[in-house]
């Protein structure tokens, strides 16, 4: 008998059962402000067209008995997920892979403003070189101010509260498949988004800009 995760959640709540949760995660945040990368976005989250501003961030997911890391890239125009990467290491290569995916799938646009927090991955020489190669401008949140990148915070909150099992995943491969399905299918094409007056991000983008975006 196959039982979906949402039914399991409801049954456990009715029976007063609590699942075993993974241990707390200690994620090293930036401790030094980076004045050389200003907050160019400055919470101007409304854009005029796709590929004007992209946002990126990293979160963590329990899989295969340890923490793994998810980097995602969001196009602010309709809050569409356009790139992601998953790895056991929260290094610069992780965020570069997510950026590469977004860049290729969006048709290699130029003059994009890329915004993130002050994580060391986004301030790394490797990542900044990739932005330079793609002719993108960089923007960073002020230190310790999550509201400067709130669209990414909301994306990850939705992923974890609506989709990721509370006990994590048995394997990293299962986590990648499941998270990919949520981000690129459910979140982009099915889930209603308040920012788009109830339209899913990909649907809103196609309606507003039928010749732009990803397939």
Regions found by a protein language model. Name each.
Residues 1-215:
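Charged DNA-binding/catalytic regions of mobile-element recombinases
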């Amino acid at each position: 008998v196959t039982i979906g995760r949402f039914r399991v959640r409801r049954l456990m709540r009715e029976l007063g059962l609590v699942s075993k949760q993974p241990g707390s995660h200690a994620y090293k945040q930036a401790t030094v402000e980076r004045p050389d990368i200003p907050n160019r976005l400055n919470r101007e989250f409304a854009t005029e067209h796709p590929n004007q501003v992209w946002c990126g961030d990293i979160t963590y997911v329990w899989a295969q008995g340890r923490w793994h890391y998810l980097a995602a890239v969001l196009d602010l125009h309709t809050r569409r997920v356009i790139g992601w990467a998953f790895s056991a290491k929260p290094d610069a290569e992780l965020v570069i892979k997510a950026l590469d995916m977004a860049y290729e799938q969006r048709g290699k646009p130029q003059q994009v403003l890329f915004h993130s927090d002050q994580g060391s991955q986004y301030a790394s020489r490797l990542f900044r070189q990739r932005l330079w190669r793609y002719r993108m401008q960089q923007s960073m949140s002020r230190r310790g101010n999550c509201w400067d990148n709130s669209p990414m915070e909301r994306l990850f909150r939705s992923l974890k509260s609506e989709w990721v099992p509370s006990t994590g995943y048995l394997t990293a491969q299962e986590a990648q498949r499941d998270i990919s399905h949520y981000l690129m299918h459910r979140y982009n094409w099915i889930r209603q988004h308040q920012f788009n007056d109830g339209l899913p991000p990909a649907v809103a983008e196609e309606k507003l800009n039928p010749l732009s975006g990803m397939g």
